[in-house]
Each structure stands twice: as C-alpha cells, then as structure tokens.
C-alpha cells in the first residue's frame, strides 16, 4: 500500500533535505535553486547552464534526487539550460505531499503547473524511474517536444522475483554501508561501483524513507495520448525490475522506440549519463 508520505516518521524529511544539500555542494558548476509552489506543495528545482539556453527538463525518480544527477547534467550540451526537478512525494528536496486518489492525473497537473511557474513552453522531458510515468501523465502532451523515459517504472508490471529482491530487503532492514552497496550493485549492471555520495544517499533513503513499491501504473487512456508523438523508452538489459519485452509491447501501442543499453541495470543516470543525454536529441528510430 502506498503511504501518504515518503518518510517513515515526522521530521525525517529534514534529514533527506540536508542530504540533498550535501550532494549539491559537490557540483563544480554554478547551480541555481528555486521553489515552485504547486498543488502538491513546494517543488524544488535546480538549473544549470546559461539562463538564456534552450531548456531541458529532467524529472528525478526516487533512486537519486535532482542533486544526485550531476554526471547527467554535465553530459548535456553546455549551451543548454538543464532543469532538474524533485517530485513531491518522492525522496528529495521537494514537499512530502503525495496525491490522494488518481495519482497520475494529479501528477500530470503538477507537472504542467511547474512548467507554467518556470515559464517554459514546449520542452524535451526526461523522466527517470518512477518519474517516467509522471512525465507521461502531463496534462497537455503538446507541451513536450520529445519524451524520454529511462529505467521506467509505472508503465508495466514490475518483476516479482529478481536478483535485487533479497539485497533490497536486507537494505531496508539494516541500511548500513555493506547492505546498501550490495543492493546498489544488484540494481545496476555488472561491474558497477557506487561512489561515496550515492552510497551515503541510499543509506539515508533506506533508513528514513518508505518503499515506493505501491506506486500505481499509468492508465491506458493517458498512455494512448502519445500516439504520433516523439517518445523513447531507455532500459538497461540487466535492469532487474523491468523486463524489455513488456516495455516493447507498450511502446508498440503508441509507436514509440525502445533503446536497450547493453551491460546496464536501472541506475542509468550513473551508469550511462552520456547516452541518456544523447537520446534526448537523437531521432526516433
């Protein structure tokens, strides 16, 4: 069951917000921070690159907050304005408010409100993890120049039995460095080594945050709106939570393309940041 807050106890959000600030201190480029006030509470927005640059919107999806997406932000053309957003209701720097009732309709309105608050018209959007289905739920699909959904959750059923299941339970039960590292390695592709900042962040998520397993899947009617639009799904061939075959099936429903990343798991912003940045502007295959 999906809880009303991503945090285990009152006050835990302050620990996570502090962790986001700590990750942000390691960025080498100047970062602009602002808060958009929306129907789901305060939404934390990071921006890098020239203020006059053409914008790209990236929605953080739970595995990492916006402040943890430095490698991805640095992989885009430096002339672009990269806007990274923490979703309310997911671990990150935004409000802990989760929608009641129709989750995707509420998040779709929220995303439109954020674009309006930032005075953004039509823009390419990259949705990561759980934010993939949120990006696909935007109220007006005409606001999206190209939609890229990476390591997407909320589109197809999650795998029930997978290599990250037991490490994930151990991490939830005792989120020390050893269990956290084992869990991250199980999520990622072979040979992945998490850095210290990612380890510390994931330890805190295990200790202070609830599971996102109860997040619902996007409704068929919302998904079908994307027929004829530029949509691409990106998934690692070693992603333990999402299998490629059902993603291909749902992509075929709307004429979307699927890019399978060899040797990668589900931590694509860390495993393949350059590829993700390139896919935002690659022609649909």
Please place each PLM-identified region on the residue numbering.
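Gly/Ala-rich beta-loop-alpha elbow adjacent to hydrolase catalytic centers
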Residues: 127-135
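Conserved HGGG/HGGXW glycine-rich cap/lid loop of the alpha/beta-hydrolase fold
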Residues: 16, 41-92
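Active-site loop/oxyanion-hole signature of alpha/beta-hydrolase fold enzymes
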Residues: 83-124
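Catalytic histidine-centered segment of alpha/beta-hydrolase-like enzymes
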Residues: 264-277
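An N-terminal hydrophobic leader/cap segment in hydrolases
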Residues: 1-35
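Conserved alpha/beta-hydrolase catalytic His-Asp/Glu region
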Residues: 158-163, 173-230
């Amino acid at each position: 069951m999906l809880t009303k807050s991503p945090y285990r106890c009152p006050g835990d959000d302050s620990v996570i917000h502090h962790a986001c600030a700590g990750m942000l201190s390691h960025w080498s480029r100047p970062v602009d921070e602002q808060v958009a006030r929306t129907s789901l509470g305060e939404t934390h927005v990071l921006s890098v690159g020239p203020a006059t640059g053409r914008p790209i919107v990236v929605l953080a999806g739970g595995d990492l907050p916006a402040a943890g997406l430095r490698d991805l932000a640095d992989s885009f053309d430096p002339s672009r304005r990269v806007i990274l957003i923490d979703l309310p209701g997911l671990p990150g720097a935004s409000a802990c408010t989760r929608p009641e009732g129709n989750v995707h309709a509420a998040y779709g309105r929220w995303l439109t409100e954020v674009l309006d608050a930032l005075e953004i018209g039509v823009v390419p959007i990259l949705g990561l993890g759980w934010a993939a289905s949120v990006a696909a739920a935007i109220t007006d699909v005409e606001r999206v120049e190209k939609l890229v959904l990476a390591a997407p959750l909320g589109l197809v059923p999650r795998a029930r039995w997978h290599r990250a299941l037991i490490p994930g339970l151990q991490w939830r039960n005792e989120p020390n460095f050893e269990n956290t590292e084992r869990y991250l390695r199980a999520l990622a592709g072979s040979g992945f080594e998490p850095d210290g900042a990612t380890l510390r962040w994931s330890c805190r998520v295990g200790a202070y945050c609830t599971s996102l397993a109860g997040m619902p899947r996007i409704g068929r009617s919302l998904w079908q709106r994307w027929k004829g639009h530029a949509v691409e799904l990106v998934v690692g061939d070693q992603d333990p939570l999402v299998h490629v075959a059902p993603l291909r099936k749902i992509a075929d429903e709307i004429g979307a393309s699927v890019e399978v990343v060899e040797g990668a798991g589900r931590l694509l912003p860390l495993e393949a940041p350059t590829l993700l940045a390139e896919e935002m502007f690659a022609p649909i295959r």
